[in-house]
Amino acid sequence: GDEIVISILEHHSNILPWQMIAKLKKATLKYMYVNNEGIISDEEIQTKITPKTKIVSITQVSNVLGVATPLKAIIKKAHEVGAIAIVDGAQGAPHMATDVQDLDCDFYAFSGHKMLAPMGIGVLYGKKSILEQMPPFLRGGEMIETVSEQDATFAPLPEKFEAGTPNVSGAIALKAAIEYINQVGFSYIEQQEEKLMKIAMEELSKLPYITIYGSPDYKKHKGVLSFNIQDIHPHDVSSLVDYHGNIALRAGNHCAHPLLKYLNAQSTNRISFYFYNTKEDVYQFIEQIKKVRSYLGYDV
């Protein structure tokens, strides 16, 4: 039967739709797995994507490990077997320059709220030739040319897929956010994030009770770093650094249950940096992490 291929790195939003489609179409959902650093090997790409593959959907950057996936190799292999290649760019678009033509992906999606825009707005890029073949998935006002009592003809792209009243304020805000990010420039964004990540990883690595997930190379963490403190639940860690240091850590499974299970971690702490963060922010974070165990009576 037909197969859909994703990776173990995926956010639930790039797992659940494919589980649903696999059940509806009686297809098989397959996973590409990663090594200890979160890297998908070329062997895994060549083995999992086969002539049975119809869809390959892959994250650009893991929202847990921060690792970038080998998109070009995956997309090339998908096209070799006649499959559609879809990229989840939610964690990639804010942190790295992306050229969808250069990638040659068939679809690319990202959300606004990871790149300085409000929640409830995002972007879906699709190749025109594919979008023209697709029927509208949602029907309503503004996506038609004509309507009769029994039938309708649909508007051309992109209106065909934009039924109902759009999130106008969200779209205006997303445009402003994208323009601002482009003004700052991705070369600066990447340099600043690397500087901050280098300090964070070097300092955390000095602490014997810290486990860092993903690559030991700070350059391979695109804006996010997941870690755990021995014997202390991430929810306690995040609450303590918030209360004592006004630091916002994400604690939990990061909407990536399969990956956390694969990493043998129930949950993790995740710190994320962006270009507006400073070295002082990182050192303040490190100082709070050093105090967490003493807050709970360890090492006293």
Question: What do these predicted regions represent?
Answer:
Residues G1-V300:
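Pyridoxal 5′-phosphate
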